[in-house]
């Protein structure tokens, strides 16, 4: 959620557009709400470490999101070594956790 002028409720939409290209190397895109387990009745009530911006809370969220992205990568037969770019949207400083957690996963 944005810090300034946040909407009344969460929302995020993403899409990928692809076209065939001869000679192109295989590629992939993974997107989505990684901070909530899939299949829940609503988003807000199931956010991992909801509202906890302590170092322990942020670390819990980072670990959950990275594990969820690993699950999605595995479903495509991929791993962190295949990832060429990652975008993370947050107002909190998670860099210390991302560095240690990604390296531990072989990224």
What does each model-identified segment do?
Residues 1-107:
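Short, polar/acidic, helix-capping and beta-turn segments at strand->helix junctions
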């Amino acid at each position: 959620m944005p810090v300034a002028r946040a909407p009344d409720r969460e929302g995020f939409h993403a899409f990928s557009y692809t076209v065939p290209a001869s000679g192109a190397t295989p590629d992939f895109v993974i997107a989505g709400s990684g901070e909530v387990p899939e299949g829940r009745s609503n988003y807000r009530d199931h956010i991992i470490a909801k509202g906890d911006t302590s170092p322990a809370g942020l670390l819990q969220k980072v670990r959950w999101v990275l594990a969820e992205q690993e699950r999605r990568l595995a479903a495509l037969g991929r791993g962190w070594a295949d990832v060429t770019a990652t975008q993370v949207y947050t107002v909190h400083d998670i860099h210390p956790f991302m560095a240690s957690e990604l390296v531990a996963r072989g990224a």
